[in-house]
Design a protein with these regions (language model features):
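C-terminal motif of bacterial Sec signal peptides marking the signal peptidase cleavage site
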Residues: 16-17
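Beta-propeller and closely related beta-sheet repeat lectin domains
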Residues: 50-53, 111-119, 123-135, 190-194, ...
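Beta-rich carbohydrate-recognition and catalytic domains
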Residues: 21-45, 57-127, 136-185, 202-262, ...
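Long, low-complexity, proline- and polar/charged-enriched segments
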Residues: 190-198, 205, 209
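Sec-dependent signal peptide recognition
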Residues: 2-9
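Surface-exposed substrate-engagement region within the catalytic domains
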Residues: 308-311, 321-322, 328
């Protein structure tokens, strides 16, 4: 891929072993070219997208939630001008690293988003969903979807209008139900990470920060928790971390401690053995630095900040930017390398048609020891 020739490696400094002069192994982050090519083929599926948020299914395979995406064929790294873009889809990858297809409404010649807010049918404004995160329970995929409408001018004139849970039937990928759980007045964008631990589902979100120049100050991390209610077939009452314990009052939600960077809109929290790991890209314009933190509890405090990687695209081309790094721990390999990714996009809306790699995610392999030690 064209963009891959710019990729950089971040290494931990070589250290001398105690009592000797044998250097320890240098740990490096590398681009996973094979997974990058597997995830985004040139035909027969979604061929350009952002989002790239994975949900592990009960059978060991994974569904990746995409945001805005294209399904048209790619020829010589290009796509036809004016090809239709849809706002969400699912990409299915097997545990054995096989591409199992993609899911959206319609046909490759005339595709539509897999799910659409009910408001789209009645509002004079354009409404759409971008993905949060989700989980499987039985034959249903429960997806937190962030709802937006076009409330301003230009490509950045979108407005957040709440968070819905969309139930998708895994037998045929039809939408079974839609329920609004937070309206547009909610200051926290809940549902951008879901982690199951013990009997709880931990639901994470960030409070959208005020932008000052290129920085967002702040964009802290919040967490709630709930259990699945078998009677209703949905999540039960939520509790919110208030800085000391758990409260039923959403207004009592307090930011998790230990973080000194603005957390990106989309991020990952997962459990590895007895350790909780947060992976996030710093939220700032043209920021490419990807960090990890660890904690002993799902709510922090977070510690052990590690700069894992700096994306090169925004420095190689001022029209490009990268964002929303995500972790996919179900694909940790035998070398104990975590699979992560970040999204690439362009301020020039024509570039993704002329070079599809300017609107495709890049996958990386990160040694777990870089995060844990």
């Amino acid at each position: 891929m064209k963009i891959l020739k710019f990729c950089m490696l971040l290494s931990l400094p070589t250290a001398m072993a105690c009592g000797g002069n044998t250097p320890k192994e240098v740990l490096t982050v590398r681009v996973d070219n094979e997974f990058t090519s597997l995830y985004m083929p040139d035909s027969c599926g979604v061929t350009s997208a952002d989002g790239t948020i994975s949900i592990l299914l009960d059978d060991g395979s994974s569904l990746f939630m995409t945001g805005d995406c294209f399904v048209g064929n790619v020829v010589d790294g290009k796509r036809k001008p004016g090809e239709k873009m849809i706002n969400n889809s699912l990409v299915h990858i097997g545990s054995d690293y096989r591409y199992l297809g993609s899911h959206y409404v319609g046909t490759p010649a005339d595709p539509s988003s897999l799910c659409t807010p009910p408001e789209a049918a009645t509002s004079s404004c354009a409404y759409w969903y971008w993905p949060g995160h989700g989980f499987q329970h039985g034959d249903i995929l429960y997806c937190f979807m962030t709802k937006f409408y076009q409330g301003g001018e230009g490509q950045w004139g979108f407005v957040f209008d709440g968070t819905d849970i969309v139930q998708i039937d895994l037998k045929d990928y039809s939408v079974k139900s839609t329920e609004e759980i937070y309206d547009g007045k909610c200051p926290i964008h809940w549902g951008h990470c879901v982690m199951k631990a013990d009997s709880y589902y931990y639901i994470y979100g960030t409070r959208y920060g005020t932008r000052t120049g290129a920085e967002y100050d702040p964009a802290p991390l919040y967490v709630s928790r709930t259990k699945f209610d078998e009677t209703s077939g949905n999540l039960g009452a939520y509790e919110y971390f208030d800085g000391r314990g758990w409260s039923s009052d959403p207004a009592a939600a307090a930011a998790c401690g230990g973080l000194d960077i603005s957390v990106s809109e989309q991020f990952s929290v997962f459990k590895y053995d007895d350790t909780y790991i947060l992976l996030t890209q710093r939220r700032a314009q043209q920021a490419g630095d990807i960090y990890s933190f660890i904690s002993d509890t799902p709510a922090g405090p977070w510690r052990n900040k590690r700069l894992l990687y700096i994306t090169p695209e925004q420095n190689a081309d001022p029209d490009l930017f990268t964002y929303n790094a995500m972790a996919h721990p179900q694909f940790i390999n035998k070398e104990q390398e975590l699979l992560i990714c970040y999204n690439v996009n362009s301020y020039d809306l024509q570039k993704p048609f002329m070079d599809v790699n300017t609107y495709r995610p890049v996958f990386l392999r990160v040694p777990m020891d870089m995060i844990l030690k």
